[in-house]
Each structure stands twice: as structure tokens, then as C-alpha cells.
């Protein structure tokens, strides 16, 4: 503020302009703005289903996420399966997570499930519920420690660099269970946690999982005495229950009761058929029960046929198309490291021996951890005599006291829970 001071000098009136500021200092010509409230920062919600829906969504960073909860899987009609009707869930909640705090603030609004991803990696299962609190669908949320990418196999397929649900594609400075991933009964979309240790025994329990309250959620199993409840509807409503085939083992190895058995669940009911050149001709397509994330699917029967020189089963390590890990110029069991590194078109990919759930007892076989590796394909396998309910294994290997073998075309009971290595659609 300027003031005019009057002073008489030699009888003359002088007007002197002076400036006044705080503490007699020169003022800032621009006045300080009035204090205000900072605007609320906009919360960016990542729509995980923006490029398509699936039963599994990958997240690679923390923050708010959402996905369409009205569509079952990819919502597609495939051979043997009609397109599913859309859902109208009443609520949503976390079922389990492998790392506490990985998923919080699960909400449902206008057919969209939203949640916040914490700063811990892991796997989780989120479910949508009906008004009577029954699970009507569930989704696997996968937060790996490294980026998911593909490598071209010698068969031409673009193969995911890690198991479905794995944290890493290879071991770090020392072997650990991070590459093991999750395990699936053939045809089911919901995963089960694998072994918590590289090796185990009959008493080994799966990796612990936790509910929204932090309490441990138990992975249970169905009755051994009956398969009457073993239906698709029951499996969807009970995503934490491994379904046993014990009561029908001699006639069907399916987790579904034999009368409900369905070859089309993973989108390739005729995938086991071969032509006159002995090649698999039906590749199938992704079904709405497929457990793989957007853009990926469970692989067809011929994906890993180059993993052995025979294209099938062999006990001769020199016939395994694997990396010579110790560099001695010989392929043998010394190149095995809780799994095999199979050669691809360029480079290699590691396939760990992530154990399995036995389909009869519907429990983890921890004694096979680090010794047996089995990987599902999307097609059924042929019956053995009068026994039905087999699924196609695109890769099965073992290494232990019982011997060493690799098979690129195997089969097993659908009630067994095995690894899945997805391929690009």
C-alpha cells in the first residue's frame, strides 16, 4: 500500500510516495492467494475385462481394479456347450488369497465387481453370490512377480512362459515353489493351491490360503462314499472343494458323477482324434469353463509332441528334448532340477514338477512334489476298457526311485488336479 507523506522543505510542500510492507520490507507485488482445499485426486480403476472376459484376470500393479461380473468365463458357445446366460449377482466377496492383504475392498455395483490390489503378489479367488448367499460364479485373480509372456514352441504354439498361477517362470538364486502355480481338476475353472515346499510327504498340506478376515480357508474334499452331489452346479457353488471319484473309481475316473460326464467342458470334445498321418486334427476353442486368462486357453493335444523324439512316451533321457543343464554333453537325470527345461523354437521353458491332487482321495499328493509333473490339455482321453472319465495330458513326467520318463501324449483321471500351461488363442 502506498502512502503520500507531506513535508515542508524550504517553504515548499513536497509529496513523497512511500511503500509500506511487513517488517519494513518491500512487498510482493502479487498478493498471496487465499488458502483453499486441494481437489480430490481422480481414482483410476483398471477394467480388467476391457479386452474380453475370462475366468482369470492378471494384475501387474497395485491399485483399483474391476471386471464384468455378469459374464461366465468368456461367455462363448463352443462345440457341445451352449453360450451361458448372463448373471445378475447380488453381492461379491473374497473367497481366498495366498497372501494376506493382496485383495481388499471387494464390492459389487451394477454388475461390476471392483477391488483394490495390494502390494503383495499371489493368487486369489473372488466370488459372486446370489441373494441366498450361494456362489454363482468365481474368478481367479493372478498377481505374478514377473510379466506373463509367450515363447514359440517347436509345434508352432505360443506358449505361456510360466504355469497358470505361478509367481515366476524359473527359480531364483535357489530352487523354490514360485514356479509351481495352481492345480486344476480337468474341466473345472477354479484352482487349488499347490505344495508349499519343493518336496514333501503324505502329510504335506497345500499352500495355506486366507479369507477376508485373515483366517485360514481350508481346501476340503467331497464324500468318498458317494458321487451323487458331483455335478457342475455343485462344483461352481463349492470352489474350495476338490471332488472325489472314489465311489465310482472302477467305472469312471471323472470328478463328475458318470451320468453327468461331459467331454466338452474345456472346448475340444473331439481333440483326441487323429488322421491317417497320426496327427491330432481338432484344436478346439476356448470354452466358458476354461481357466486361462484373456487371450489364452488350455492347449490342444499336440502342443508338446516335440518334447520327446518319439512324440509320445519314453524312458530314455536321450530322447527328451531338454536343456543340457550341467553342460556335459549328455542328457540324463543330472539335468533334472525339480522339473525339466524343454527346448522351444528359440530358447527353452521350465516345466516344474508341481505335484498333483489325487482324484480318489481328493487331496494333495505332497509326496510327488518335485518328482511328478502333469499338465492338462483341453480334450478328453479315450476310455480304458469299461472305465471312462479320462482327460488328455499334453505333458507328464516323473523322476525318482520309480524311474524316469516323459510323455507328450498321456492321460489321467479327470478328478486328478494337475498343472495348466496356457497357450495363445
Q: What does each model-identified segment do?
A:
Residues 38-286, 312, 381, 414-416, ...:
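Short, compositionally biased
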Residues 1-5, 15-44, 422:
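Bacterial Sec-dependent N-terminal signal peptides
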Residues 11-14, 192:
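N-terminal processing/targeting junctions
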Residues 148, 166, 252-425:
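C-terminal, surface-exposed recognition/capping segments
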Residues 1-5, 20, 186, 251, ...:
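Intrinsically disordered, low-complexity sequence elements enriched in Ser/Thr/Gly/Pro
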